[in-house]
Amino acid sequence: MKHLHRFFSSDASGGIILIIAAILAMIMANSGATSGWYHDFLETPVQLRVGSLEINKNMLLWINDALMAVFFLLVGLEVKRELMQGSLASLRQAAFPVIAAIGGMIVPALLYLAFNYADPITREGWAIPAATDIAFALGVLALLGSRVPLVLKIFLMALAIIDDLGAIIIIALFYTNDLSMASLGVAAVAIAVLAVLNLCGVRRTGVYILVGVVLWTAVLKSGVHATLAGVIVGFFIPLKEKHGRSPAKRLEHVLHPWVAYLILPLFAFANAGVSLQGVTLDGLTSILPLGIIAGLLIGKPLGISLFCWLALRLKLAHLPEGTTYQQIMVVGILCGIGFTMSIFIASLAFGSVDPELINWAKLGILVGSISSAVIGYSWLRVRLRPSV
């Protein structure tokens, strides 16, 4: 029990559990003895009905759309705290992750197109390396425990949120044909209600969560990635203390263990089980995986580093206090972990064209993401001193 308590008290414990869950999923998805059970579990239908409203999704989508909205709620709370009171409190500091995210989307896409522009079919996958899997990127960072300055974690969160918002916009504009404007209208009303609650000084967290559920349902029905609702709710929950209590900080404290030890490991288990059937190393010589690997492994850190350097030179932004430019470069490498978000975009780009293209894309995403994780983790482990 003493060793167990020590493990869960460690800052790295959440990241370790997430990686174990991901490895277990890969083994089960590619083992003849367990692959059937694994996929049956993910395809288990779960239905929720309230009056005439019905949400009928399989287990995988409930994990990705519902549980991960809670993760994004926590991320929204943490980023808001830093924007209001912490390392991103000034306009130029807050602009830094925005500029970094823009570079981290543009350069990987251009690098991918450098390989695939001549092929009108594979060209459609240009957005694949522009995505970052925030959960796995933070999971790798968590493996370093207390070595990692909080400000660096917040910078990665802020950058990845903007990256995810960019990916959601890209999906909506280029890969979605059936957006529901009525549902988007309901979502807009829910956001307006959240704003009014905040302006009126309402401090009951439950009220925000209730409106957040309406917002999540509307965003889900609209065809846009539903996890976006979590970030929005997090930004509206009051942060200021009154009588020594802050609703945002209190909720952040409550959510953290649930996210670290249940939601993120479940997400990893549900999404890391990529079947390697039909995937061969010979495919690495094709322009599709080469473009993805180049975009994730080279384009991400290059784009983030270049745009950050330009922002500093032109005095458009400031480095977050307590960080170095070299640390920002390594965060750029970790942002090359595209994984589930990249696989999702690949399925949208090639799902109706050729299943073999999806296999090649998966190969490129796995190689690029794993390489980014290993290099980023190793570099930070060498450069960051353990806290005493």
Swiss-Prot record:
One of its GO terms (molecular function) is sodium:proton antiporter activity. Pfam families: Na_H_antiport_1. Its main location: membrane. It is found in: Cell inner membrane. One of its GO terms (cellular component) is plasma membrane. The keyword Transmembrane applies. Residues 1-11, 81-96, 131-154, 201-204, 237-253, 311-339, 381-388 are cytoplasmic. Residues 32-58, 117-122, 177-180, 223, 273-286, 351-357 are periplasmic. It catalyses: Na(+)(in) + 2 H(+)(out) = Na(+)(out) + 2 H(+)(in). It is a multi-pass membrane protein. The keyword Iron-sulfur does not apply. The chain crosses the membrane at residues 12-31, 59-80, 97-116, 123-130, 155-176, 181-200, 205-222, 224-236, 254-272, 287-310, 340-350, 358-380. Keywords: Antiport, Cell inner membrane, Cell membrane, Ion transport, Membrane, Sodium, Sodium transport, Transmembrane, Transmembrane helix, Transport. One of its GO terms (biological process) is regulation of pH. Na(+)/H(+) antiporter that extrudes sodium in exchange for external protons. Belongs to the NhaA Na(+)/H(+) (TC 2.A.33) antiporter family. This is Na(+)/H(+) antiporter NhaA. It comes from Shigella flexneri. The lineage of its organism: Bacteria, Pseudomonadati, Pseudomonadota, Gammaproteobacteria, Enterobacterales. The gene is nhaA.
